């Protein structure tokens, strides 16, 4: 296995595709996706384009669907949910399909949706995702951070490093053998430095600060910083649709 990290969708190579791709948006899309599927959502259908989301959601019965979305960290007007992992409770989302669009995370998914294996990861499920990859051992794996509007993000790089660390431990490989680019090595070094205080890093990150300025997101930050609290692996079942597999 060779593991490469790209800190935003814009950094993904224009040509070719890896055997497996892992989309990461710790604050907060892929954390919310993991919790939603854990709590019984039928599926999550992700969209970068809001008009496409509206068209798809309108085709589903109201009692079987929910619209979830944010822009700039704030819930979209007229949507049922924003992008908080704490809002996707079993009572709210159980059995329903969530039609979702976020500022950054759904763009990352859209960029690699042609990958033969597409998973989503966050700190909350990094070991479960690592185990899935170790079961299949794809030759080339791309981790794609969501970043913030094309810029680097600390929190996504932390999760990429955490996933790399779990793959190193599970495979017995060296970083020299596993890392496909310098960004993977840098992400792993970031994880080594902050693995004992991930929430502190999320609060240091620019998007963590942005969320704190928008309101009381302490509980969201604590949830997103929890490592290996879930064993779910969201996986693309059909283009743009994530389920548990």
Swiss-Prot record:
It catalyses: (2R)-O-phospho-3-sulfolactate + H2O = (2R)-3-sulfolactate + phosphate. InterPro entries: ComB-like (IPR005238), ComB-like_sf (IPR036702). The keyword Acyltransferase does not apply. One of its GO terms (molecular function) is 2-phosphosulfolactate phosphatase activity. Its EC number is 3.1.3.71. Pfam families: 2-ph_phosp. Its cofactor is Mg(2+). It is an enzyme of class 3 (hydrolase). It comes from the Bacteria. Keywords: Hydrolase, Magnesium. Belongs to the ComB family. HAMAP family: ComB. PANTHER family: 2-PHOSPHOSULFOLACTATE PHOSPHATASE-RELATED (PTHR37311:SF1). This is Probable 2-phosphosulfolactate phosphatase. It comes from Synechococcus sp. (strain RCC307). The gene is comB.
